[in-house]
């Protein structure tokens, strides 16, 4: 469940017209080769507890497959409130993908790229500390997503906190 992205926190998704092939257009129910703008908020939830209810529903619909969130840490209270809701409700996310502020999308406003949100290193440590402090670190996996371009980046982020990573290409 994508909550935010490092290159454009608070902005919805934008799929540029050249990428909206007939196959993608059919799957999304939109015209081919026209920009597709997705809203920045989910209609299914607006609070951490509603997020967890939605995640649980998705997990059930997917036959028990793992469900998690992707976010760029902007306001620390956002992840703190999600972790608190997991503690209070007992409903867990299976993973949290932490996206660093190091932008990696052509759809981001230039002034946002690399400048908004927490850098991946700091964000990984923060999310790991939140989960450890709540006693949930062994139940919730952490994935990293940002400019991970080398084997060194992978080793460094694994040493910091991550259990998995997402990278477009490695050198």
Where are these regions (language model features)?
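Flexible glycine-/small-residue-enriched beta->alpha junction loops
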Residues: 1-34
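Short glycine/proline- and acidic residue-enriched helix-loop micro-motifs
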Residues: 33-41
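Glycine-rich phosphate/ribose-binding loops and adjacent secondary-structure elements
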Residues: 43-171
């Amino acid at each position: 469940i994508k909550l935010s992205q490092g290159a454009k926190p608070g902005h919805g998704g934008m799929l540029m017209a050249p990428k909206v092939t007939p196959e993608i257009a059919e799957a999304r129910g939109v015209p081919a080769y026209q920009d597709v703008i997705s809203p920045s908020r989910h209609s299914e939830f607006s609070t951490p507890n509603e997020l967890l209810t939605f995640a649980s529903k998705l997990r059930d619909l997917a036959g028990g497959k793992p469900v998690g969130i992707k976010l760029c840490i902007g306001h620390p209270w956002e992840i703190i409130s999600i972790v608190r809701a997991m503690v209070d409700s007992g409903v867990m996310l299976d993973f949290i993908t932490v996206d660093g502020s190091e932008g990696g999308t052509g759809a981001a406003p230039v002034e946002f790229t690399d400048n908004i949100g927490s850098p991946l290193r700091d964000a990984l440590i923060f999310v790991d500390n939140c989960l450890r402090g709540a006693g949930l670190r062994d139940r919730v996996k952490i994935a990293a997503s940002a400019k991970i371009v080398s084997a060194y980046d992978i080793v460094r982020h694994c040493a910091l906190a991550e259990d998995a990573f997402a990278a477009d290409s490695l050198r």
